[in-house]
Amino acid sequence: MSAIRVDRLKKSFGDVVAVDDVTFEVQPGETFGLLGPNGAGKTTTINMIVGALCPDSGQVRVNGQDDPTRPEVRRSIGVAPQSLALYSELTGEENLVFFGRLYGIAKERLGGRVEWALAFAGLTDRRKHRVGTYSGGMQRRLNLVCGLMHDPRVVVLDEPTVGVDPQSRNLLFENIEALKKEGRTILYTTHYMEEAERLCDRVAIMDHGKLLAMDTVHNLLGQHGGPSTVEIEFDDRPSGLEALGGAWDKGRWRVQTESPVALLGKASAAGQLANVSIRRANLEAVFLNLTGRSLRD
């Protein structure tokens, strides 16, 4: 049974089609990424999955249940929304207690969940500080654990690292990777390609409300990423490279190829290699090849 199943989902706001015939499944324990620019339809899709929006047509099933608004379904889902769901005038601890009570956690269990959440987010020493004094990264980590207070098996993370510095982003990555190791199902939306490459088992690329491609990162790169770029410095500039294509640029030979390893073998036969760099295709290149534009356009 799929943890999440979305079948031919559609949603419009007036004349604007936000989600257009979207279908995908997320398996138990899988981290599934929805990758696309702002306005692609990712958050609208998420909101229909968690029951915050009703689709115009199509069906959502979570853990085999076909109505995400039912209390037992909502209890199985944890959500960290893109817009912070925090009360800035409350302390970090008070926010966690509030959300724990909102989820109906029993009093005898609530204290333990609060301690776990503070430790998991690295905020134990800031528990008595008002959230309004927290850094952006600290608020994002608190936002994450507020959605985990009831220990859900399905976790929905909508742009969880937006607006944070690189160090805070890495701390959030560590949190998410820890959730992966626990076997939780994670639905992850982002417009940062490197996040999807690092965290996701499979990725669906979305634009203008449609799914353009869906597969593992490795397969997407192989199918849509295009060639790798190889740059080589030689001890002495050899002859005979013209047959391999490419061009010289500031003392370096640069060539695009689908087979970097084979190319390096031929280049080493032509001369002694001094330095080699290989830039492989990434999800930015996949998106560019699928849409003809940059992910950040």
Task: Give the residues covered by each predicted segment.
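ABC transporter nucleotide-binding domains
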Residues: 2-6, 11-207, 213
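Solvent-exposed polar/charged
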Residues: 75, 147, 198, 222-223, ...
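Solvent-exposed beta-strand sheet faces enriched in polar/charged residues
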Residues: 7, 63, 233, 277-279
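Non-catalytic alpha-helical coupling and interface elements of nucleotide-dependent molecular machines
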Residues: 104, 225, 229, 292-296
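ABC transporter nucleotide-binding domain
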Residues: 171-261
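Non-catalytic surface loops within mature trypsin-like serine protease
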Residues: 28, 125, 234-236, 257-259, ...
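C-terminal coupling/interaction segments
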Residues: 258-297
